[in-house]
Design a protein with these regions (language model features):
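Primarily the HKD phosphodiesterase
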Residues: 19-85
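Acidic/glycine-enriched edge-of-secondary-structure segments
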Residues: 1-13, 31-37
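Signature of lipid phosphatidyltransferase scaffolds
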Residues: 7, 109-147
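Short acidic loop-to-beta-strand element that houses the catalytic metal-binding Asp/Glu
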Residues: 99-102
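A conditional alpha-helix N-cap/helix-loop micro-motif detector
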Residues: 12, 41-42, 91
């Protein structure tokens, strides 16, 4: 049996095209762990999330509690959380949260890029298509208890 994991690397210039393609094709589950959230990034992604919810895709977003966000961004975070909650997205707040990852069905994205806020920083993300990698990550992070 071949246990080789096939993965691909992306940077801040190539990530969103690939990620949004995966996101649009989600069938049953999306988990996004992003400690930071901005209105600019949410405006790009919210229409896709809305379509996924209309197809009954289970979406979970894990971020920091409101009081851990910088005051300059707090209003944007409150707005974005409200938009997502109105869509029926499950929002989790984890104190001290700093993980940057996503699960889209059997695809795991992990790295340094804040998916819901990235703007002009130099980042890297790895895409792994593997049910086992998804299972391992959701178990390791404790997200499996929300599934």
């Amino acid at each position: 049996m071949n246990n080789t994991l096939v993965s691909h690397l992306y940077d801040q210039n190539t990530f969103y095209d690939a990620f949004l393609k995966d996101l649009r094709q989600a069938k049953s589950l999306v988990i996004i762990e992003s400690p930071f959230i901005t209105k600019k990034r949410m405006q790009v992604i919210s229409s896709i999330l809305r379509k996924l919810r209309a197809r009954n895709v289970h979406i979970i977003v894990n971020t920091k509690p409101f009081d851990e966000h910088e005051s300059v961004f707090k209003e944007q975070v409150i707005w974005a959380i409200g938009v997502m909650q109105d869509m029926g997205i499950d929002i989790l707040f984890t104190s001290g949260h700093h993980r940057k990852l996503a699960v889209i069905d059997d695809i795991l994205w992990e790295g340094s890029l804040n998916i819901l806020s990235q703007n002009d920083s130099c980042e890297i993300m790895r895409r792994i298509k593997s049910k086992n990698a998804v299972k391992e990550m959701t178990r390791y992070t404790g997200m499996n208890k929300w599934l």
